[in-house]
Amino acid sequence: KTVSSNEEYFRVRENGNDIDKDIDRDRNLFEILPQIIERREQTVIFCKSPQRVAIVMAKILESGLLDLMNVNSELSLWLKNTYHDDWTLASAIEHGLAYHHGKLPRALSSLIVELFNKEELKILVCTSTLIEGVNTSAKNMIIYDDCITGREKLDAFTFNNISGRSGRMFKYFVGNVFIFGQRPEPQLPF
């Protein structure tokens, strides 16, 4: 149950492709992330696709903003040994950063959510899997992409489901929603 959320909007150019718009999105992201990291607040970042999730997570990891946490070292090593030594997710997990999307193995997806809920991961970059039966909440929700898939814009219902993951009852009484772009207009049933 959402208690209260502060919404803050950040400009993203309306024309152009994702590469052009990502200049604005990344500027916005790296404007707010240092404060969030300093306050050690749980944060979820919504992106429209598994590919975008991996790219945004890699940008955060490469920024050097996150210190090594030494909490998930065993998991990181296991991922490197089991999947690939250079898997960015394996390295990110050691810094309290991970991603979540429907293409991950189910057991790994569940473990990532569990670690996030236990605050062993501080930043979770994810797709709409966040609103599809994943039980988690965060102090901050960053809506990086304003589309659900491809170019299909978020509708008001989906936007509210995603932003509603911030500021949950008995955990974070006031959440923060950072929106890169504009809030979708509500669709009235009449």
What spans do the regions from the language model cover?
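Glycine-centered flexibility sites
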Residues: 96, 102, 119, 133, ...
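Conserved C-terminal RecA-like helicase domain
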Residues: 13-16, 20-125, 148-160
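Conserved nucleotide-binding/hydrolysis micro-motifs of P-loop NTPases
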Residues: 49-53, 105, 130-132, 147-149, ...
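Post-DEXD/H (motif II) to motif III coupling segment of the RecA-like Helicase ATP-binding lobe
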Residues: 1-3
